């Protein structure tokens, strides 16, 4: 685990974005942890979040021309990541996002920001069922751009309804790499360093054993 990944876990814990306990997911599964990126909700949170996303992008080595944030959660993520890449990595890249409903006045169209072209890096909070990615792919393909990759904050590394995860389905269906700031494996590595969190470690390991990919 890299220093920025450990820092991201601590940031998420401090903001109660990441919690350990017993939680029932939408799928009906009982999970020993819960991650709610919507609680990154202040100016400072967003500034820090952008730096973690930018760090993960640079670390990945994936080449791309533009950041795309799917509405709605992806919009602030794309914006703050673009700022962080420019400020901390000297990479001044365009970004854009979609509207849920197209406008018929003003700028018009369903996109806001830069023209959607070239190699697109899609940024979002998490992938649950992959629906937002599929909707975004329709937009990207309609503009004759290509999907360079997808970056999310957390990869739960667990099976969907079939034998593979929603993330693996996206990689298979679109031939792109999905990267994340942290994974379930990183969470386990972090818990292993914290003797006072041993009870959570056992529960998360058991969950991975049952649902992991």
UniProtKB/Swiss-Prot annotation:
Pfam families, A to Z: Pribosyltran
UniProt binding sites for orotate: 34-35, 128, 156
One annotated GO biological process: 'de novo' UMP biosynthetic process
Known catalytic reactions: orotidine 5'-phosphate + diphosphate = orotate + 5-phospho-alpha-D-ribose 1-diphosphate
Sections of the chain in a coiled coil: none
GO CC annotation: cytoplasm
Matches recorded under Gene3D superfamilies: 3.40.50.2020
Pathway given in the UniProt record: Pyrimidine metabolism; UMP biosynthesis via de novo pathway; UMP from orotate: step 1/2
EC number: 2.4.2.10
Keyword tags: Glycosyltransferase, Magnesium, Pyrimidine biosynthesis, Transferase
Gene Ontology molecular-function annotations: magnesium ion binding; orotate phosphoribosyltransferase activity
Residues that bind 5-phospho-alpha-D-ribose 1-diphosphate: 26, 72-73, 99-100, 103, 105, 124-132
Cofactor(s) the protein needs: Mg(2+)
Annotated InterPro entries: OPRT, Or_phspho_trans_dom, PRibTrfase_dom, PRTase-like
Assembly description: Homodimer.
Family note: Belongs to the purine/pyrimidine phosphoribosyltransferase family. PyrE subfamily.
Alphabetical list of NCBIfam families matching this protein: pyrE (TIGR00336)
Function, as annotated: Catalyzes the transfer of a ribosyl phosphate group from 5-phosphoribose 1-diphosphate to orotate, leading to the formation of orotidine monophosphate (OMP).
Protein name stated in the entry: Orotate phosphoribosyltransferase
Organism: Salmonella typhi
Organismal lineage: Bacteria, Pseudomonadati, Pseudomonadota, Gammaproteobacteria, Enterobacterales
């Amino acid at each position: 685990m890299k220093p920025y990944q450990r820092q991201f876990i601590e940031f998420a814990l401090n903001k109660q974005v990441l919690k350990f306990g017993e939680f029932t997911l939408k799928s009906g599964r009982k999970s020993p942890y819960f991650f709610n990126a919507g609680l990154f909700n202040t100016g400072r949170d967003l500034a820090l979040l952008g730096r973690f996303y930018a760090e993960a992008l640079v670390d990945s080595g994936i080449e791309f021309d533009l950041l795309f944030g799917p509405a709605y959660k992806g919009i602030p993520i794309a914006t703050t990541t673009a700022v962080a890449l420019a400020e901390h990595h000297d990479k001044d890249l365009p970004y854009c996002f979609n509207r849920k409903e197209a406008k018929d006045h003003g700028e018009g169209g369903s996109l806001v920001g830069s023209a959607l072209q070239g190699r697109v890096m899609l940024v979002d909070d998490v992938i649950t069922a992959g629906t937002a990615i599929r909707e975004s792919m329709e937009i990207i393909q309609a503009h004759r751009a290509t999907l360079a990759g997808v970056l999310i904050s957390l990869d739960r590394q667990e099976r969907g309804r079939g034998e593979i995860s929603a993330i693996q389905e996206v990689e298979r269906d679109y031939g792109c790499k999905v990267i994340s700031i942290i994974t379930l494996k990183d969470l386990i590595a972090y818990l292993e360093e914290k003797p006072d969190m041993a009870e959570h470690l056992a529960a998360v390991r058991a969950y991975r054993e049952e649902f992991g990919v």
